[in-house]
Amino acid sequence: MSSLADQLKVIKEKTASVVLDRKARSKIHSRSLIFDPKVASTQDYDYLYQLGLEGLDELSEIDSRFSKFRHTLFSETSVSMDRNVQTKDVISQLDKNIDAFLTLAGPFYSLAPTVKAVEWLVRRFHINMHNGEMLLLTSLPHYNQSVFVKILNVIPKNSFPKIFDWVVGYKDLLKNPPSSSILKAFHNDFEFFKLYAMFLVEQLKNGTVYQEQLSFFLSTTVQLLASLSKSLDTLNENHLPVVLEVVGFLLLPSKYETLRNIDVDTRLTAYSIIAVLASIIPISTELIRSFTESILQDPRSLEPNSVRQTLIVLSQLWRFYQGDFSDREAIVKCFANLAPSKLIKVEHLVKDLVADNYKFQKFLTFYFFATFPNPESYKIFQLVDLGKSELYFSEIAKQIVENSTATDKCRSVVIHICEELLKSNSELFIKALATQEMNIDALEMKLMTTLGSNSSVRDSDDVEFDAGEEDNNDEETEEVAVQFATAANLDSIKSSSKSFFTSSSDSEFSKLTLDLISLLRNVTVKVQKSLLLKFTTSVFSSIETGISFLIRIAFTPSIPLSIRLTAIRCTKWKLKEASTSSSSPLDLYLLIPIFLLGVYDETRVVRAGFVQLLRFIKETTTSIHANKKKVKSVLFMEDVIYDTTEASKRAIISPNDALFFTELLLKEDVLEDVIIDRSRLVPKFGQLILKTFVINQWSLNFFPVVFKWRAWNIVALENKNGTEDRFFFTDSDLSEYFTKRSNWIQQANDAKIAFFEEVEGAIVGLVGGNSTNEAKTATEVDWIIQSLNSQFSNLQIAVNSRLLEIFNNFSTVENRIKIVNKLIDLLNNDEPIESDPMDTLQTLKLDQDLFISVLGNVQIGGQIPEQGPAKRRRRSSSSTKQAMAREDINNMASTHLKKLTIILDLLETNLRNGTETIASPNLLQALFKILTDLDYLGNDGNLPVLYAQEALASCMILSIVKMKNSDETFKFDSNSIRADLIVNSIRSSQSPQVQNRLLLVIAELASLAPEIVLHSVMPIFTFMGAHTVRQDDEFSSSALQQTIAKVIPAVAANGSSSISNEIEFLLTSFVTAFQHIPRHRRVKLFTYLIRTLGSDLSLHVLLFLMGQQYCSSLNKNKMADAQVILEFTSSFLKSFSAIEQLEGISKFAELWDMIPIAELEANSEEYNKLSTRSIFGVSILSLTNSGLSTLRIEMLKYISSVVATENSNFDANTLKTKVAMVLLDSSINDDDEEKKSILGSFRNVAAFLLSSLDTFTNVSRNSEIALSLYDLLANFLNLLPIHYFVDSIFESLDVGKFSDTLSIKVAKNLVILAGAKFESELSSINIDEKIEESVLEKLLPVLLHGIKKNVDIELEQAYLDTFAIIVNKFGASTKTLATPTNSRLLLESLQAITSENCLLSESPETIISSINAITSIVNVLGVKTIGIFPKIVPPSLKIWETTTHSEDEESAKLIQSSIIVLLSCLIKKIPAFMTSSLDSIFITILSSDYVDNSIRTSVLGLVVEHMDSSQVLKSLCNIWCNKKFYENDNTGNIGLYLNTMQSTIDKIDKKSAATQSTVFIKWLIQAFEFRHYSEEADNKFDNNTIHRLESSFHSCGISYVMKLNDKKFRPLFATLVRWAVEGEGSNFSENTEVSRLVAFFKFFNKMQEQLKSIITSYFSYLLDPVASVLTRFSSGQLKDINLRRILLNSLTSSFKYDQDDYWSQQGRFDSICNPLLEQLTNIEEGIGKYLIKSITAFINNVASEEYNETLVHGLIKYISNEKEDNSSSTKIWTIRALKSIFQKMGEQWLTYLPTLIPYIAELLEDDDQAVEMEVRSGLVRVIENVLGEPLDRYLD
């Protein structure tokens, strides 16, 4: 039975939406997901229904399952349905429908239709109150979206599900919870995690789970499991069962069609959780198997979209499997749904995953054992890595032994696996077999095969061939043999073959072999022999056939070794039997070649057996033919061996030769070494004399592969260095190889011979080698070509490898060409081949003749008709185009083009490697022919020839370079090797890469054979200028540079007089394309160009051409392009030395001078002369007079701008710096050639410019050209160091030599230039005697003379400015000007500068320049200028006064600035003499409104720093008080004044401060009245401005007070008090008492904050006035809130800082107590708090029983009803005062509680509710806190 609380909770939930109050109902109705509460509260259900229905319809279009809710939750009847009046069953069904809808809507919460539909459920059915848990569960995956916040917001707190309490805080903040909070909730509340997990399970059951939900659950679960990894007990007990249950449902195949789309996501979620579980907790073997079975039970887990993830999770699971193979049935069961064929289908995926370091081995190992044996087991085994695990090897050995008698298909799998095990770790496998009481031989017998190549297992020194039992078959063995023979029914087995040495007997041999192995598999070796003998006797019709069968058994590797050895023994037995039973002697030596092949067997014991057989033959032959007597014998098995071979082709030796052969073969145990190492047979075989007999038999074409492959290997090894023996096989095996290959592969596979390694490799080894038989060699070449062209990849690879070994052994070029051509054809074909023909070709050593022949075979030009010898200029032929249009010719040309490309690539590789001397004129001639052919193919055939042309050009370059580096002397055919052919190709090609490479060909050809290139120089240069320079890549740039570097020297070396014309033509071509050259490449390109051509021959030409480009841009108004040209020229010139640049400028001037002055006639001599030079051309010669004049002017401007740029930059690469480095280098003598050259260049240019000036001034008058020449001259001379420069210009500045206005302009420009030069270059470091002499003795006198003459205003200004710069620079750097001589000169200058022509002139510019000059002189001479002081300061101040009302603001600003600078200089240099003018100086500085404040501030700082502080302070006070500076309209000026005042006060010493204190107090009083002044002047300044200024006044006042002692300050303070109270000393009679008191107390309050208790006693001066003012406030006589506030704050501060019981003195207490308390009667609301603070501070300060008693009764008076005039406001403020007092005083005032209790009680019953509440909520609570108990019992 539930508790009462649970019952109440249920009732509450059911009635959550039942409210009777209309306001509460409205509040519930206003909760909305979409609308604002105010809007929502007014909406009716009809509107909301339509909105929800609209959302439902849209959702139904997305998912049709939503449509069923149209008849329930969204039916028309739902509009009027009220869940609060429904029955329990109806509500239950309603809740189910709601839950179903919400779970279905889960994926779509972020969509607007879903929000609309859920809005209806919230508003109508109140699901936010009744179904909140489901609403939150379904929306939880959307926790980071805005819809989740909306859902949180609509759920009321009182209806919030308890399990979701963790999210309530985010509901209050209207924020999305972070993922960390959700993880924390899952971690801290297992029930919450379980709830959501079970909810997910229900979703899976119902088919409503979705991707976002799976992602949410996965991320949180993974993090939860990781966080619980250190609390495994909790994890295993609580969370693990829940997680496993969820995983189980996730792995179940879904029955819902709707989940098909996320089936993969569901499965991946389960996989991820499983992987995490496996990594953090130890999983039992049963659980791993269960997981595996569950994963594989769904067929879709192995579909392509899931198989990768399935394999990964299985591998991760089985990594942690700790079981063994004991529970095999369970392991087999868990893998039942993973058929091996399915795994093999994704074999490549498994390998990729293993390569990606996924740990698959354990999973694959157990899976292999679980599915073994199976037809796919071997493929699975290849994926397994058993390592060195004895457990795994033991288990697999057990499985193999148990399944060794399986079906044929599975047995072959077992055989393959056994062979792999022997290869990987034979020792461990044999050891594992031993544990199963099995060995290799026994296993081979069970499997009826030989296990691979087991020579390494069985070939040991203690294993010997045992033939000793041949004659000892006991009766018991015979009896057993008979039994087995009878059981096998041998009589029913008969052979029809005559011989088993032929391939035709293969099928019968295979059948008989199976019967034989079945017969022998379970018997001992002794019984094997007997049975085998019976088998041969019974089955075969003749003894020869039986012996051939036995021999073939012994040769077949797939037959178990024990049977093979038995067959050898039986062979010997049968040979003996044949010898003894024959009536005639039998010669057995025809078997020697076959037995020799047996000696080459891989197994040592087999080799030993065949050696025994050879010995037996030797014994037999010796016994027959040992005597010299001829014995007629029979050749045993001749027909069986040779079959149908003609007798003439049987190379059979005679018996005597046979005897000799056997003795030689077995002499001194020759074959004993072969038993140990079979490879020793090859050299011994090569020494045999009668080996023709042997090889003839080996080469019989009908022999099976089991015999042949050994013969091929022996001869192939012998053929390493070449042998004629190989030709025995040419006509038989090689010629028939391609027809027999498939049959041989089958034979090899049946015999378990590795065909591709052992057979095919040996056959290929028979091909090639040294030989003199050209016919046979040609046959071999054809065979090689056929092999390379075959479809057999292994053969291609083998032949390719062999070809690399033997290629150079082919003596004839024809054979090698055939092979090379075939390789090229293979490359040209589109069919895939295994080997890389190009790699082969590149590896082969190809000589010059071979390349020329191969190139000659590629007749690309021969396909095109009408192609004659290459012409100088080839034009396209229409007939050629028509021919190329034919498809067959076009295809043929394309094929040959591909071949050519291959050959050229190959040639390039060989030329680069340089292994052979390939390069020659003949090769180059062939390449040139191809160059022409490629032009035809590209232009007429439209074939893609670009790559071929690039390759061809590379080959040409390499060939030329190789020949150039060779010591040989080459002769070239000029008819075939022609530069014009290259030029034609360059022009016709559209590829920059091809063009660049061909340019490099020309470059290299020019250095090798310059005579070939000389005739094509012009076209080359034209092309480079038109195309190459425009390319923006490093290759083009490099090609261009190399071409120029090699062609130009070739032209120069030719001795042609036209080199300058060639250079001009080249540069013209390049400069014409200047705008198209990438900007970042221009400088490097032209620098390299000029360096290559020689700066003396080309620099001036380039400058001239660039000048033309500059003029052209100006004429077209392309100013940006003109500026680019200037920037380029400046950067370009930095790469050259000073002398190179100067010579270039000098020669440029000569070219400029050659520009015609007037228009030329067409056929005049000058016209013809200039027209031959490309740098002039028609563009200049066709100009009119005005055009020529403009060209000259703009060319001058161009070069002048370039020189000016050189002057303005100061880096180390400029011309100016380079000139200075030479001329000023003291280590270089004046006679040095470089220095002379530089000065000579300057003289030449200057002389030219001066002569040109004369020409255009006097002869051909042109003022613009003359001015341009002057500018250039000035800029050019500016390149010189200072003293050189001064020497060159000072005469031009002498006004006495001026002849016209042009001279004035020139002088002005030169003097301005000089000033700039001095400004930038003069310093203490570089001023020396030469500079001093030039400037002081030459330049300054000339300037002074010009100033005095005053020829021109602008000239006068320029002279004054330069004069000032010189004086400033010298004055700052040296003391030269301070000498008497120079001082007199400067004073004389000062006289002239202060005259009417300068300082007193009417020109602002002249005035400014004069002031600057005066400033510079004063700065140097200082006090020496005192004599002229009256001519400086008073005029300057008068001039300043004229600027205050000037209309020209710019001039006024400059004049004011210059005057202020002058004054600052005077103040620094002669401060004592400036005292008398201090007032004027201050007014001048402070009132210079046009000058920036920062400048004026610094000058004012100089005044304060350098002048006497007393005088400065006095002056400042004077201009304020007497000259009324406060009337200045600019607050910024007043601010500057106050800053200066502050600085002065800070600097002044205390003694001076005391002296000037009276003056300062007077200033301070007047400053306090500034507010009144402003108000009187119609509120001149706003309130904020006045506040800022008053703050500065107070700061100055306090700073000054700090300088005074108490004795000095008290009378001053009294003066201030009298001014404030009585108005004494006031400057404004209208100033009111309130205004004065406010100003005073503002200042006083700040003083108190600064000085604290030091000035508490000063209140004595204020006590009575303050008490009086307070009384007037309480009585209502005075009303001013601001004053009252300031006054109360003043008292509070005084009370607070009183440390000497100043206010505890009775008289003072009595004076202030009542006036202060009386303020409670009418204190204003806004400042009451200040009164409370003041009273509290007062009581705290004067704390004593007597005073407290007085204060208590004083306060009671204002709360008691006894005083009838106490207003509610008075009571409230008094209550607040008491509250503050109790808070401050605490227990000290509890003694007065009995006195206060009655009044408190009375106040609690006051008629005014506000009073009652103030007491109850304020005072009572404070007292209770202090008292520590309720106040009720005292009140009662």
From Swiss-Prot:
<feature type="compositionally biased region" description="Acidic residues">
    <location>
        <begin position="461"/>
        <end position="473"/>
    </location>
</feature>
<keyword id="KW-0690">Ribosome biogenesis</keyword>
<feature type="region of interest" description="Disordered">
    <location>
        <begin position="863"/>
        <end position="883"/>
    </location>
</feature>
<keyword id="KW-0812">Transmembrane</keyword>
<feature type="repeat" description="HEAT 3">
    <location>
        <begin position="813"/>
        <end position="850"/>
    </location>
</feature>
<feature type="repeat" description="HEAT 5">
    <location>
        <begin position="1749"/>
        <end position="1787"/>
    </location>
</feature>
<dbReference type="GO" id="GO:0000447">
    <property type="term" value="P:endonucleolytic cleavage in ITS1 to separate SSU-rRNA from 5.8S rRNA and LSU-rRNA from tricistronic rRNA transcript (SSU-rRNA, 5.8S rRNA, LSU-rRNA)"/>
</dbReference>
<dbReference type="InterPro" id="IPR012954">
    <property type="entry name" value="BP28_C_dom"/>
</dbReference>
<feature type="transmembrane region" description="Helical">
    <location>
        <begin position="1085"/>
        <end position="1105"/>
    </location>
</feature>
<dbReference type="Pfam" id="PF12397">
    <property type="entry name" value="U3snoRNP10"/>
</dbReference>
<protein>
    <recommendedName>
        <fullName>U3 small nucleolar RNA-associated protein 10</fullName>
    </recommendedName>
</protein>
<keyword id="KW-0539">Nucleus</keyword>
<feature type="region of interest" description="Disordered">
    <location>
        <begin position="453"/>
        <end position="473"/>
    </location>
</feature>
<dbReference type="Pfam" id="PF08146">
    <property type="entry name" value="BP28CT"/>
</dbReference>
<dbReference type="Pfam" id="PF23243">
    <property type="entry name" value="HEAT_HEATR1"/>
</dbReference>
<feature type="repeat" description="HEAT 1">
    <location>
        <begin position="245"/>
        <end position="283"/>
    </location>
</feature>
<dbReference type="InterPro" id="IPR040191">
    <property type="entry name" value="UTP10"/>
</dbReference>
<keyword id="KW-0677">Repeat</keyword>
<feature type="repeat" description="HEAT 4">
    <location>
        <begin position="1333"/>
        <end position="1372"/>
    </location>
</feature>
<dbReference type="InterPro" id="IPR056473">
    <property type="entry name" value="HEAT_Utp10/HEAT1"/>
</dbReference>
<dbReference type="GO" id="GO:0000472">
    <property type="term" value="P:endonucleolytic cleavage to generate mature 5'-end of SSU-rRNA from (SSU-rRNA, 5.8S rRNA, LSU-rRNA)"/>
</dbReference>
<comment type="similarity">
    <text>Belongs to the HEATR1/UTP10 family.</text>
</comment>
<dbReference type="GO" id="GO:0034511">
    <property type="term" value="F:U3 snoRNA binding"/>
</dbReference>
<dbReference type="GO" id="GO:0000480">
    <property type="term" value="P:endonucleolytic cleavage in 5'-ETS of tricistronic rRNA transcript (SSU-rRNA, 5.8S rRNA, LSU-rRNA)"/>
</dbReference>
<keyword id="KW-1133">Transmembrane helix</keyword>
<dbReference type="GO" id="GO:0033553">
    <property type="term" value="C:rDNA heterochromatin"/>
</dbReference>
<dbReference type="GO" id="GO:0030688">
    <property type="term" value="C:preribosome, small subunit precursor"/>
</dbReference>
<dbReference type="GO" id="GO:0034455">
    <property type="term" value="C:t-UTP complex"/>
</dbReference>
<dbReference type="InterPro" id="IPR022125">
    <property type="entry name" value="U3snoRNP10_N"/>
</dbReference>
<dbReference type="GO" id="GO:0045943">
    <property type="term" value="P:positive regulation of transcription by RNA polymerase I"/>
</dbReference>
<dbReference type="InterPro" id="IPR021133">
    <property type="entry name" value="HEAT_type_2"/>
</dbReference>
<dbReference type="InterPro" id="IPR011989">
    <property type="entry name" value="ARM-like"/>
</dbReference>
<feature type="repeat" description="HEAT 6">
    <location>
        <begin position="1790"/>
        <end position="1828"/>
    </location>
</feature>
<keyword id="KW-0687">Ribonucleoprotein</keyword>
<comment type="function">
    <text>Involved in nucleolar processing of pre-18S ribosomal RNA. Involved in ribosome biosynthesis.</text>
</comment>
<feature type="repeat" description="HEAT 2">
    <location>
        <begin position="585"/>
        <end position="623"/>
    </location>
</feature>
<keyword id="KW-0698">rRNA processing</keyword>
<keyword id="KW-0472">Membrane</keyword>
<dbReference type="GO" id="GO:0030686">
    <property type="term" value="C:90S preribosome"/>
</dbReference>
<feature type="transmembrane region" description="Helical">
    <location>
        <begin position="998"/>
        <end position="1018"/>
    </location>
</feature>
<dbReference type="InterPro" id="IPR016024">
    <property type="entry name" value="ARM-type_fold"/>
</dbReference>
<dbReference type="GO" id="GO:0032040">
    <property type="term" value="C:small-subunit processome"/>
</dbReference>
